[in-house]
């Protein structure tokens, strides 16, 4: 961190299936964050640090409470599966660490809390955020879990990090970055409207809960979603809009842009009828 003024810490394990033990995700998340913050404190030059947490550190265990969750809310730790718990503990340890720094080592802290990140891909690596798209487009999931997700566009999340670095009133704040919440059926219907004519068969039927329990015996990734079946995710993006000045990207655009980029980059097989993103091509030609 020598000679650095600003640091953004974005890395944290995001498993596609439940780990064998909690420590597989909790220890890297907490210790990794602590190591970055310690290095910043020793640098003598770092003025502000942005830590990427998650909206799960806010809504887990608080779904269906009947009110809009904000940055003031914290997940119920006892209700958290390992990944969600890792995000809560890593963020809480970050706030506590900075709070206890001596004056000569103090720096400003901002935390960004995105949801399930979607949008175009700019790298050649597979990641957990691609799983829903890949399974739907390739019909690897014949039925859907009745799951609601807080959707974030990766471009909005990137903008939030930059604004968190530069805005004078950002330090000491958490910022939920989301375009809104969407049920899996709405997600699938968005893909279906765009891609059925291009040869993709997208499932839109919900799987009953007992069916998911049976599937979880053979697919560990299914097990992790069962506790959240049917639960409403109601989180506010007011601070994102009013304080960071970010207009949320429409969820449908995030979903469609990600699908096209996954197909174009080879993460999803092209059908014979695939035409590419015509709206993007039209924008480029206009």
Walk through the language-model features, giving the residues of each:
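Active-site "gating" loop of Rossmann-like NAD(P)-dependent oxidoreductase/epimerase domains
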Residues: 54-81, 122, 137-138
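Active-site Tyr-X1-5-Lys
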Residues: 42, 77-109
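NAD(P)H-binding glycine-rich loop region in Rossmannoid oxidoreductase-like domains
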Residues: 1-31
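A conserved pocket-lining segment of Rossmann-fold NAD(P)-dependent short-chain dehydrogenase/reductase
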Residues: 18, 76-80, 123-124, 130-156
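Glycine/proline-rich active-site loop of Rossmann-fold NAD(P)-dependent oxidoreductases
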Residues: 103-105, 119-132, 164-175
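Conserved C-terminal active-site "lid" loop/helix of NAD(P)H-dependent oxidoreductases
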Residues: 215-245
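Short-chain dehydrogenase/reductase
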Residues: 26-30, 67-92, 126, 147-152, ...
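Mid/C-terminal beta-alpha module of Rossmann-like enzyme folds, strongest
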Residues: 160-223, 251-262, 266-286
